[in-house]
Amino acid sequence: MPQLNTTVWPTIITSMLLTLFLLMQLKTLNMYYHPPASPKLMNIKPHNNPWEHKWTKIYSLHSLPLQS
């Protein structure tokens, strides 16, 4: 039975890996990657809330005097 010639295998494997690497590089070169998101500048209008102009006091139950 003849023996299998394996002397060219490293060359074949190296060329295969190089070809796969180049094909993947060409494939990813054609892809479009979105640029990173940047914060959007927004004009914030001040809200006109009626309770901001009034003085209000919130009473908690613990601060009220005891009723007997």
From Swiss-Prot:
The modification N6-acetyllysine is found at residues 54, 57. Keywords: Acetylation, ATP synthesis, CF(0), Hydrogen ion transport, Ion transport, Membrane, Mitochondrion, Transmembrane, Transmembrane helix, Transport. The chain crosses the membrane at residues 8-24. One of its GO terms (molecular function) is proton transmembrane transporter activity. Disulfide bonds: none annotated. GO terms for biological process: proton motive force-driven ATP synthesis. Belongs to the ATPase protein 8 family. This is ATP synthase F(0) complex subunit 8. The gene is MT-ATP8.
